[in-house]
Amino acid sequence: MTQVAKKILVTCALPYANGSIHLGHMLEHIQADVWVRYQRMRGHEVNFICADDAHGTPIMLKAQQLGITPEQMIGEMSQEHQTDFAGFNISYDNYHSTHSEENRQLSELIYSRLKENGFIKNRTISQLYDPEKGMFLPDRFVKGTCPKCKSPDQYGDNCEVCGATYSPTELIEPKSVVSGATPVMRDSEHFFFDLPSFSEMLQAWTRSGALQEQVANKMQEWFESGLQQWDISRDAPYFGFEIPNAPGKYFYVWLDAPIGYMGSFKNLCDKRGDSVSFDEYWKKDSTAELYHFIGKDIVYFHSLFWPAMLEGSNFRKPTNLFVHGYVTVNGAKMSKSRGTFIKASTWLNHFDADSLRYYYTAKLSSRIDDIDLNLEDFVQRVNADIVNKVVNLASRNAGFINKRFDGVLASELADPELYKTFTDAAEVIGEAWESREFGKAVREIMALADLANRYVDEQAPWVVAKQEGRDADLQAICSMGINLFRVLMTYLKPVLPKLTERAEAFLNTELTWDGIQQPLLGHKVNPFKALYNRIDMKQVEALVEASKEEVKATTAPVTGPLADDPIQETITFDDFAKVDLRVALIENAEFVEGSDKLLRLTLDLGGEKRNVFSGIRSAYPDPQALIGRHTIMVANLAPRKMRFGISEGMVMAAGPGGKDIFLLSPDAGAKPGHQVK
């Protein structure tokens, strides 16, 4: 069935221009690229764009640390990012920057329309201000104690321990991340986007059925909580676009970042002249399709602020958001210390791009699920699927065709019904690519690969080749195998661009979706060359080690206590919550006969007595001095039978050991039995 050609604009979230691309980023760009390549194979007009997100305080401060201008830093980072994406064969039509004249003009245009339409409000707010650096502090540049769970060293917008959200002014004992100074409160006039005015429109958009169910459900929670006005301004000093007629005020990075999609496309239109129309894709009544591939961490901005901004400034809204989950490696969060925080460029020094493209694709679906890159499974799957099932199908047949028949395929199919089974699968596989059910598409393709290899096994061309008078049979069998290989590679073309190029060179024909309906008969193929090499765990080990070495090279050496006693593996809040810490009064302290390390402590928990053995004797030669002190103990530690008796808990102490052990004590006012929270 012939499809009507569509005009489609596809974007990926804009990478922030203060760091390298890593394998977490690559999931999204690979997912989008596979989808885009499939759309192009089906004859649709696709414009695939991206840009660097190049504004904000973090970029300004990092440039200062490096002793260069922000413009120089983002320019160098853009080149690095584009090199990485090209290395993974991401087929962007344009890659730009939010720090561009196109983006400035569009940001000012959208702001002016929102203002004219009454959606921009002014009001004075109180903010934390760094008196040493002379700057207002964004949320992430303030740290202090969480006002909810009292965990120290938490950012100014949310607690990474208990998950609570709050404003920077709610932090206990806040400190500037920039200078370490205690911030002060200062008033400043800010500009707010009236998001609540768009609640009805956004709810209708949510109910349209276009969005993923998980996204729609999350949006409904936000609607029920009530939408708030959105602060779209920041005070100088700030690296970004100054707001028109508001000296010293700048657009918040999240205002001009999504407009960067438009800016990059405008840049592409200007390059191509009349062949692409900006208005055709962005005007209010546009019939072109607009899709944003994004991670689940930025759904809020793309599902609420962005469509509301577009609606309020008379531009079209996205057709849909395609949201994905995070990447874990070997079942855990990417870790620099374990060597699993892997940069895109590091990967390409050890593996080809097609291998990761295939592994991610095989695991992706249309749901917002996290993807685990299990490196051992990665090696096994790439070898089993790409090498053993697909490439091997070509290699085990091509030799006979090249040597015995001068590269010419048979003039008829040996098994037309089997070939029809392969071509009939185009509809199911195509629908899976279209609906982003990538894992399903791969499973369907590999099931066909199994059928193809079973055919070759049953026909045994290596046996036929030794039998006189069966040259025609040999040519027919091997030609059938090569034709089935051609169909498989056509289905895999969106995923494996480099392998596809080599396959097309061997087959001496371009692989097209509709082309498989006509098998290659009497066709001359080129001499077969190895299409793909097996991979092994030694490459994985080298990759992990290289990632560790990169971290060492870019990280200042740790000195002091952390050098001798590194921080342990991360635990979850649920794990931490199991530990019951209590204030205890030391009623008695005495030596333990037969031990030169232990003291026996009698602790009062406020109505309950505990006997605890503690290895602090070297630091407290006079145990009587501890009597009457308050300390902290682990109250729910299972009793431990020791040679000297049963220890019913553990007291908390710090220090490297020996004489340098320091028993922890609470502030004055804490009572025995109080829980430490």
Curated annotation (Swiss-Prot):
Q: How is the cofactor bound?
A: Binds 1 zinc ion per subunit.
Catalytic activity of the protein: tRNA(Met) + L-methionine + ATP = L-methionyl-tRNA(Met) + AMP + diphosphate
Record PROSITE patterns:
AA_TRNA_LIGASE_I, TRBD
Q: Binding residues for ATP, per the UniProt record?
A: K336
Write down the required cofactor(s).
Answer: Zn(2+)
Motif, 'KMSKS' region: chain positions: 333-337
- Under Enzyme Commission nomenclature, its number is 6.1.1.10
Query: Mind telling me which Pfam families this protein's record contains?
Result: Anticodon_3, tRNA-synt_1g, tRNA_bind
According to the record's subunit comment, the protein's assembly and interactions are: Homodimer.
Family stated for the protein in its record: Belongs to the class-I aminoacyl-tRNA synthetase family. MetG type 1 subfamily.
What name does the UniProt record give this protein? Answer: Methionine--tRNA ligase
Q: Which organism is it from?
A: Shigella flexneri
